């Protein structure tokens, strides 16, 4: 069964983040209304653009999304 993007993102959490994706994961963990079950790029992207002040750049999401897609190929 495929993971949602949020489930994947939670595997990237790190108490001492080494990169922007890890920091994104740490912040998303505390986001109570993040679309946790979604696997839809457009839905998550739109949500982040409108609601995620903690995400400094959408390119961070793009990078995390690419890693997510790569992880789902196996």
Curated annotation (Swiss-Prot):
Q: Which residues form a coiled coil?
A: none
Please provide an example of a Pfam family that matches this protein in its UniProt record: YozE_SAM_like
Signal peptide start and end residues: none
Family (UniProt) = Belongs to the UPF0346 family.
HAMAP family annotated for this entry? UPF0346
Spell out the protein name for this chain: UPF0346 protein PEPE_1063
Provenance organism? Pediococcus pentosaceus (strain ATCC 25745 / CCUG 21536 / LMG 10740 / 183-1w)
């Amino acid at each position: 069964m495929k993971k949602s993007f949020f489930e994947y993102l939670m595997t990237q959490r790190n108490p001492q983040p080494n990169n922007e994706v890890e920091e994104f994961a740490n912040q998303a963990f505390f986001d109570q209304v993040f679309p946790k079950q979604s696997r839809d790029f457009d839905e998550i992207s739109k949500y982040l653009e409108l609601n995620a002040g903690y995400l400094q750049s959408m390119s961070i999401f793009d990078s995390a999304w690419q890693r997510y897609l790569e992880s789902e190929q196996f």
